[in-house]
C-alpha cells in the first residue's frame, strides 16, 4: 500500500534513492502496459502526486534536520524544501503534517517528529521535577580552583561548581578548547572530597574513552 514506507521506513533506504527507484519502476511499468507487456509492479496510485511520497519527503527533511542538530523545523522552511524536492505532490503538505508521526505547534509554527517531541517532553519533565526538589551543598568551591597544582580555573569555569552546589541539574556547555575538561576534573575532586558518589557517562563509546582519559576515571 505504501512503497515509500516499505523502502524508507522498513528497509532504511534514503528518501531520494527510494524516490528515484520507485518513480523509475512506475515509468517502466506504465511503458510495459502501453506496449502490451506485464508491468513490473502495479501501484495503487500515481506515485509522483501521491500523499505517500509527500509524507516520506517531509519525514526525510525532519530527519535530516535532526542530523544537523535541530529537533524542530519552521513550517515555512519545511514546506519550501518539500516543494523543491517533490513539487508534484507538495499541495498535500498540510495533510501530511497532520500525520500521527508528526507534531505541529501552531504557536511557534514549528514541526517535529512525534518520537523526538515526546522524548524531549519527557526530558523536560524530569529536569523540572529535579529542579523542584533542590538539595543545596555548602562547599568551599575556591578549594578546587587549582587543578593538579598546575591549571587555574577561570571565574567562568569554576561557576559550574557553584551551580552544582545550588541545583540538582546543571548543563556544562562549550565548544572545543573552552575548558570543560578542567571544570569536570574540579567537579570530580569536589565530589570525592565530600564523599559523594558519581558516575561518568557519555553518549558514544568514543566520547566515553576521551572522558576517561581526561579524568583518569571509568566512563561509559
Regions found by a protein language model. Give the residues of each.
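Conserved ATP-binding/catalytic motifs of P-loop helicase motor domains
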Residues: 1-220
Amino acid at each position: 500500500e505504501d512503497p515509500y514506507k516499505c523502502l524508507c521506513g522498513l528497509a532504511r533506504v534514503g528518501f531520494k534513492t527510494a524516490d528515484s527507484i520507485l518513480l523509475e519502476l512506475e515509468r517502466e511499468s506504465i511503458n510495459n502496459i502501453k506496449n502490451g507487456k506485464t508491468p513490473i509492479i502495479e501501484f495503487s496510485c500515481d506515485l509522483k502526486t501521491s500523499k505517500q511520497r509527500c509524507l516520506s519527503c517531509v519525514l526525510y527533511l525532519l530527519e535530516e534536520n535532526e542530523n544537523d542538530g535541530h529537533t524542530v523545523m519552521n513550517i515555512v522552511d519545511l514546506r519550501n524544501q518539500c516543494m523543491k524536492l517533490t513539487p508534484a505532490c507538495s499541495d498535500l503538505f498540510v495533510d501530511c503534517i497532520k500525520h500521527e508521526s508528526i507534531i505541529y505547534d501552531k504557536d511557534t509554527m514549528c514541526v517535529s517528529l512525534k518520537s523526538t517531541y515526546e522524548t524531549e517532553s519527557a526530558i523536560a519533565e524530569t529536569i523540572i521535577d529535579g529542579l523542584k526538589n533542590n538539595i543545596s551543598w555548602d562547599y568551599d568551591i575556591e578549594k578546587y580552583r587549582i587543578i593538579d597544582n598546575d591549571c587555574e580555573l577561570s571565574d567562568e569555569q569554576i561557576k559550574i561548581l557553584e551551580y552544582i552546589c545550588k541545583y540538582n541539574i546543571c548543563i556544562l556547555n562549550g565548544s572545543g578548547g573552552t575548558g570543560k575538561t578542567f571544570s569536570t576534573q574540579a567537579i570530580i575532586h569536589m565530589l570525592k572530597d565530600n564523599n559523594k558518589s558519581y558516575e561518568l557517562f557519555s553518549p558514544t563509546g568514543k566520547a566515553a574513552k576521551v572522558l576517561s582519559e581526561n579524568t583518569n576515571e571509568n566512563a561509559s
